[in-house]
């Protein structure tokens, strides 16, 4: 019995082309294309072209069993053609071939739908002043960077609750909607900030120093502040002529969260106390003593001062 070869559909193999989309971009049938080799084109009947195959493709979710069986539908029996698909990888398969004269086999390719970039808005400053409390740094996803009806939040915000003085990086990590990624295709968004020392509560002292003593021996009164007071130059020795001169004093708080501050402090110079004693002297009756000598019995001279610098005269007030 003769066989009518025209009743047997001709088998033609084509290759689906891989494609890439971003989440939110519409996928149309025109986006899904294929290639056919010259050897396969030769199998076309006279007068037919590639368009004569009436071939359309579809993109569907990847299920291993579907690929092996050649199914052209997803798990629910639907495809995503013309709809928003979640970010991920899809397989491009045969949808329909309207020309029954051909048995069209489509070698599948992948459609990669990449995540859409979401913009982050920081409610934060670059610098803060120490208060002992967290700075209140927040990070949110800009609503206008999302598709309509989509919602997306930051999964975790780390290192934003610092309270001590220092330089830090707040980290926004991950997004609750897997279809989105931080701008720049990053997994983490960073905000750099620093907490600066605060002004301390301090009252600088009243200072007195005895003539000839260095500021190291100065007496301070009336100071307040949880820290250390010191002169910028505590070796300075002031003279009476410099009474009430301004000297730079530095206050360093014990708590490093507060600033070290300086102030010009007036210094009162007090006279140096000395006790002198006239030397014992004897004379014969009728003899005149023109100069009486003396010595320091209590106290000492300052620096390079000499006895004659004191310009003290001792006189006899009674006796012959």
Model-derived segments and spans:
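Solvent-exposed beta-strand/loop surfaces, strongest in extracytoplasmic domains of secreted
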Residues: 1-320
């Amino acid at each position: 019995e003769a066989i009518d070869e025209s009743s047997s559909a001709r088998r033609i193999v084509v290759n689906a082309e891989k494609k890439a989309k971003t989440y939110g971009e519409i996928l149309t049938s025109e986006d899904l294309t294929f290639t056919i080799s010259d050897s396969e084109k030769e199998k076309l009947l006279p007068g037919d072209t590639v368009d004569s195959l009436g071939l359309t493709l579809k993109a569907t979710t990847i299920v291993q069993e579907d690929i092996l069986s050649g199914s052209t539908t997803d798990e629910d029996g639907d495809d995503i053609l013309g709809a928003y698909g979640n970010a991920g990888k899809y397989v491009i398969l045969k949808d329909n071939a309207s020309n029954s004269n051909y048995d069209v086999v489509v070698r599948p390719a992948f459609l990669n739908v990449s995540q859409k970039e979401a913009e982050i808005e920081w409610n934060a400053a670059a610098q803060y002043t120490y208060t002992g409390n967290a700075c209140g740094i927040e990070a949110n996803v800009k609503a206008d960077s999302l598709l309509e009806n989509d919602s997306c939040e930051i999964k975790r915000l780390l290192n934003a609750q610092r309270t001590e003085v220092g330089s830090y990086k707040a980290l926004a990590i991950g997004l609750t909607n897997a279809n989105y990624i931080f701008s720049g295709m990053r997994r983490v968004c960073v905000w750099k900030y620093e907490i600066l020392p605060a002004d301390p509560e301090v009252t600088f002292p009243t200072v007195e120093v005895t003539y000839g003593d260095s500021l190291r021996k100065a007496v301070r009164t009336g100071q307040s502040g949880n820290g250390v007071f010191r002169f910028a130059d505590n070796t300075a020795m002031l003279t009476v002529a410099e009474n009430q001169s301004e000297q730079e004093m530095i206050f360093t708080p014990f708590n490093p969260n507060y600033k070290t501050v300086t102030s010009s402090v007036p210094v009162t110079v007090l006279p140096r106390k000395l006790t002198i004693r006239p030397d014992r002297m004897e004379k014969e009756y009728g003899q005149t003593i023109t100069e009486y000598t003396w010595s320091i019995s209590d106290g000492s001279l300052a620096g390079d001062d000499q006895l004659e610098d004191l310009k003290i005269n001792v006189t006899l007030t009674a006796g012959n």
